[in-house]
């Protein structure tokens, strides 16, 4: 399992805060952040993202996540009608990892599409989940050419949620002796349990500099926070699906494409300040990427391996 480390927990002291913020905000190359390629397989080709809804979610909440997944490869018939910066443009940063890993090969680029949606409102495995139960839920989705995403509702507890992680990504082997490995993700709705850890900057942080929380672009602190964490974990899954791709640090708690840029969403970011963002003039919601169906999302900066810097959309 690979942890999505709390953004503010990564700043272990005021000294570390100031050094990290200066390098990230100025976009200067920082060798400490360089993600090493460990020669393992990366996801490629057409991959379905299957959503496994565990607990009660409103249809409007499910639409936020499904629209985000659709937005990853969403293109408009004409470039003039495609709002920029877009979610699809944000995702293209991950392609740079593939080109560096296989410079002489013509491997199929990764293309993510929204797959099946499985709804388990009755919480068939109970409302207190362990990692093993998360893996069991993830196995309900397709196990070939798929990423299975388990999304837990606000009243479901998961080991470590709100204490050491906001979500995880990992891999498991499918059923049968010759079952192939498949990738999975878990993200929880932190709205009532730990919004200060997992829904910043839409909620005041538990630790660190305090500033007024931003307005969530889809008017749902929990779900907009889930989008941030899901986006980070999807980037990590694409570039380090089986624990031997691009990462830095310990294999079971690595820095990856998004977690290498903690707390950065726009230019000028520093601890307690997400960066200079776009603001919806009607709702007041802060965002940095346009998505499908008129959506607006706030997405984390991604580490750009070609520049050794954190790349932001705005």
From Swiss-Prot:
Inducing factors: By the synthetic auxin naphthaleneacetic acid (NAA) and 24-epibrassinolide. Down-regulated by kinetin.
Location in the cell reads:
Secreted; Secreted, Extracellular space; Secreted, Extracellular space, Apoplast
Any GO CC annotation of this UniProt entry: Golgi apparatus
Where does the source fall among the domains of life?
Eukaryota
- Tissues where this protein is expressed: Expressed in root tips, vascular tissue of roots, shoot apex, rosette leaves and embryos.
Signal sequence span is 1-21
Pfam annotation, one family: Phi_1
One GO biological process term is: response to brassinosteroid
Q: List the disulfide bonds.
A: none
Major localization listed first in the record, in broad terms: secreted
Keywords from the UniProt entry: Apoplast, Secreted, Signal
Q: Which InterPro entries does this UniProt record tie to the protein? A: EXORDIUM-like
Q: Provide the phenotype resulting from gene inactivation.
A: Reduced leaf size, root length and biomass production due to diminished expansion of epidermis and parenchyma cells.
The text of the family note is: Belongs to the EXORDIUM family.
Q: What does this protein do?
A: Required for cell expansion in leaves. May mediate brassinosteroid (BR)-induced leaf growth. May play a role in the control of BR responses in roots. May be involved in signaling processes that coordinate BR responses with environmental or developmental signals.
Q: Further notes on this entry?
A: Over-expression of EXO promotes growth in both shoots and roots.
List the protein's name: Protein EXORDIUM
